Amino acid sequence: MSFFVNRVWYGNHFLQWILVPFSWLYRIVIRTRRWYLQRFCQQLYPIPIIVVGNVTVGGVGKTPLVIEIAKKIQQKGLKVGIVSRGYKAAIKHFPYEVKLNDSAELVGDEPLMMARKINCPVVIAPKRNEAVRYLLDKHSVEIIISDDGLQHYKMGRSIEIVVIDGMRKLGNGFCLPAGPLREPDSRLKQVDFVIVNQGAAGGAYSMELIPKNIVRLSTQEEVSKDSFTSEVAAVAGIGNPQRFYSTLSQLGIKFNPYSYPDHHQFKPHDLNDIDLPVIMTEKDAVKCYSFSSDKLYYLPVEAKLNDSFWEAFWSHQQLQGYY
């Protein structure tokens, strides 16, 4: 898979041209699917549904943005809820409201991280409409945010926000399987907001992921980056680990990289044999609480967007009268 990602999707390998006919077929299928679901299957709701998604395969930094939007909504005095698919969640009955003492293996790493960082209900369900209805019935929320779900067209939405990785952009620009696009780049013209994570693009808003103090997993004690004067192990099980490694480099931390697949369920043996202090992402850290030790740390990040985005966001017609 890494060959496709690095050489074909984000490079100029000849194999992409062999796969282009399949990409055109894929475009026809997804266009037809979208038309059908929107016309015949989409469920609409009486409150704003904000979808934060992406048009590429892999991680782009959606979850920190979801957390920041939820916090901003709460600051307006509004009740917000979050729905998520719960990717790789072991639980089998849905919809399910994430509890703070749940394990990442049970409910998924991103839903658990969001539930622990925001004082609002987080509900998982592969069929997102079930999660939306649960929030409306059980919590009387005023605004719902969907973490991912841009292509889940059975769920109605009021605002669509697409996040793009500023390092990798849209790759070679082709749809699957020749490229990383879930939908053609023309889809960007139809959404309400395009946000570039750690970069810039014409007509898009820029987002920065600001690193906070490093935290020791076992005690939740904040530790200065200056404490790490010797080499550490940088562990990442995210869609684009290079972004995490670049952040550590910018902080002046020397490290050996240990990359795992996105959403990897860490076990003690993954980390026990590493003789160095381990710094991981916050998303990975929620999977390691049950076997935390003094050598495990994580680096939280916070999404930061400029005032122009928030002015445009709160001026959106779908949010009028909600604050």
UniProtKB/Swiss-Prot annotation:
Keywords: ATP-binding, Kinase, Lipid A biosynthesis, Lipid biosynthesis, Lipid metabolism, Nucleotide-binding, Transferase. GO terms for biological process: lipid A biosynthetic process; lipopolysaccharide core region biosynthetic process. It comes from the Bacteria. Its EC number is 2.7.1.130. One of its GO terms (cellular component) is plasma membrane. It is an enzyme of class 2 (transferase). ATP binds at T56, V57, G58, G59, V60, G61, K62, T63. Pathway: Glycolipid biosynthesis; lipid IV(A) biosynthesis; lipid IV(A) from (3R)-3-hydroxytetradecanoyl-[acyl-carrier-protein] and UDP-N-acetyl-alpha-D-glucosamine: step 6/6. InterPro entries: LpxK, P-loop_NTPase. Belongs to the LpxK family. Transfers the gamma-phosphate of ATP to the 4'-position of a tetraacyldisaccharide 1-phosphate intermediate (termed DS-1-P) to form tetraacyldisaccharide 1,4'-bis-phosphate (lipid IVA). This is Tetraacyldisaccharide 4'-kinase. The gene is lpxK.
